[in-house]
Swiss-Prot record:
It is found in: Cytoplasm. One of its GO terms (biological process) is L-arginine biosynthetic process. It comes from the Bacteria. Keywords: Amino-acid biosynthesis, Arginine biosynthesis, Cytoplasm, Lyase. It catalyses: 2-(N(omega)-L-arginino)succinate = fumarate + L-arginine. Its EC number is 4.3.2.1. The gene is argH. This is Argininosuccinate lyase. The keyword Plastid does not apply. It comes from Nitrosomonas eutropha (strain DSM 101675 / C91 / Nm57). Pfam families: ASL_C2 (PF14698), Lyase_1 (PF00206). NCBIfam families: argH (TIGR00838).
């Protein structure tokens, strides 16, 4: 094939303008699909030979040529050419140069439409497997940290106001559960990714006696796509992945927001290792939580990629349209960003320094055991709404005295309810509050440790 000649140029009376070449070429980013393009071509060629569509000698030449091309790509010796538009035609050009007519026969019973759909699915399947493993790694770090702090008391918040005491381990386990669902979503998404489009050709299938099941088996697909129009035109599997990725990033963004708050002097709950922070060019004292801030910021970009793909697909008629070329950069960046975020997050949390004293002191502020006092009254026969009102009055009284509920005298408390007795002070302690939530899903240290054991049994070794 001549270097400047297009595979489809026979129909046209003049060459494509250089600006149009640059505008329409995708090889600048879809070269990343080369490994998967070659995998698909190996399987396609073997099927063509097995069904006697091409001779065995052509298969041998194609396999040898593809092997050489992959070595050239891995070694940085492959010459990517803009005028060949994309990863597929660049590889085909080189294969034809190496093998002659055998290389020209590889595209029999195949279109770039089903070829690229196959490449993307192979790429995304591998990415999902890697991301799931990274989620497991982060979950193990969360469990290790939660185990260390199963009994470390911190304030639980609603509306960012002190609500009730919780254990820091219990708080961390909330993110374990979020990541558990995130991993399950990806595993479910993988089922829909793992279907073979190859054989759909341009849009209507092919007149050759192909064996799609053979190709599916060789490439590890669970099934074939059962409608040729759908196989080449939809990218819902990529959108589903990006939605799952956006949820993962959203969860990590929430944790990042908390790390940023907890690291501030106003909280002082944690210290993030220096290697994850930067300083200020003007303020010598500054230690800025750049990694959590960037996770929070990059989440917006991942959300944007999801919207971009949805918008890309929303008005396309069947079947394939050139619009779909724009699916790759958002998808690639989503995969790259998510993998980097999960990797760096596991390392950052593993080196987290926790200040239990600061957490405990914060839990003592804000009347975190007020609900425990209300529950105490209910257990002694007071209707909950009456108990709620009684404790609210006691809190206002304590505020005026600038002390905690547990620092009031028994006589002070009995002003609000005569049924309050000396045993009330057991439930007004932070430890008593934690211990009283001793049921599955509760924040009692015993339940936190049980939850950690259960969680470890859910993860692979």
């Amino acid at each position: 094939m001549e270097k400047d000649k297009k595979t489809w140029s026979g129909r046209f009376s003049e060459p494509v303008a250089l600006l149009v070449q640059r505008y329409t070429a995708s090889v600048g980013f879809d070269y990343r699909l080369a490994e998967y393009d070659i995998q698909g071509s190996f399987a396609h060629a073997r099927m063509l030979a097995a069904t006697n569509i091409i001779p065995q000698t052509d298969l041998e030449a194609i396999e040898k040529g593809l092997t050489q091309i992959w070595e050239e790509i891995k070694n940085g010796q492959f010459e990517w050419q803009l005028e060949q538009e994309d990863v597929h035609l660049n590889i085909e050009r080189r294969l034809t140069a190496l093998t002659g007519d055998a290389g020209k026969r590889l595209h029999t019973a195949r279109s770039r439409n089903d070829q690229v759909a196959t490449d993307i699915r192979l790429y995304l399947r591998a990415a999902i497997d890697e991301i799931i493993d990274l989620i497991y790694g982060l979950q193990y770090v969360l469990l290790d940290l939660a185990e260390q702090h199963a009994a470390t008391i911190m304030p639980g918040f609603t509306h960012l106001q002190v609500a009730q005491p919780v254990s820091f381990g219990h708080h961390l386990l909330a993110y374990y559960e979020m990541l558990l669902r995130d991993g399950q979503r990806l595993q479910d998404c993988r089922k829909r990714v793992n279907q073979l489009p190859l054989g759909a050709a341009a849009l209507a299938g092919t007149s050759y006696p192909i064996d799609r099941e053979q190709v599916a088996r060789e490439l590890g697909f669970d099934d074939i796509c059962h409608n040729s129009l759908d196989a080449v035109s939809d990218r819902d599997f990529a959108i589903e992945f990006c939605a799952s990725a956006a949820l993962i990033m959203m969860h990590l963004s929430r944790l990042s927001e908390e790390l940023i708050l907890w690291m501030s002097p106003a909280f002082g709950f944690i210290r993030i290792a220096d290697r994850f922070c930067t300083g200020s060019s003007i303020m010598p004292q500054k230690k800025n939580p750049d990694v959590p801030e960037l996770v929070r910021g990059k989440t917006g970009r991942i959300n944007g990629h999801l919207v971009a793909l949805l918008t890309l697909m929303k008005s396309q008629p069947l079947a394939y349209n050139k619009d779909n070329q724009e699916d790759k950069e958002p998808l690639f960046d989503t995969v790259d960003t998510l993998k980097d975020t999960l990797t760096i997050y596991a390392d950052m949390l593993a080196g987290l320094q926790v200040n239990p004293q600061a957490m405990r002191q914060a839990a003592l502020r804000g009347y975190a055991t007020a609900t425990d006092l209300a529950d105490y009254l209910v257990k002694k026969g007071t209707p909950f709404r009456d108990a709620h009102e009684t404790v609210a009055q006691a809190v206002r009284f304590a505020e005026n005295k600038r002390c905690d509920l547990g620092e009031l005298s028994l006589a002070d408390l009995q002003q609000f309810s005569a049924i309050i007795e000396q045993d009330v002070f057991e439930v007004l302690t932070l430890e008593g509050s934690l211990q009283s939530r001793n049921h599955p899903g509760g924040t009692a240290p015993e339940q936190v440790r049980a939850a950690i054991c259960r969680a470890r049994s859910q993860l692979p070794d």
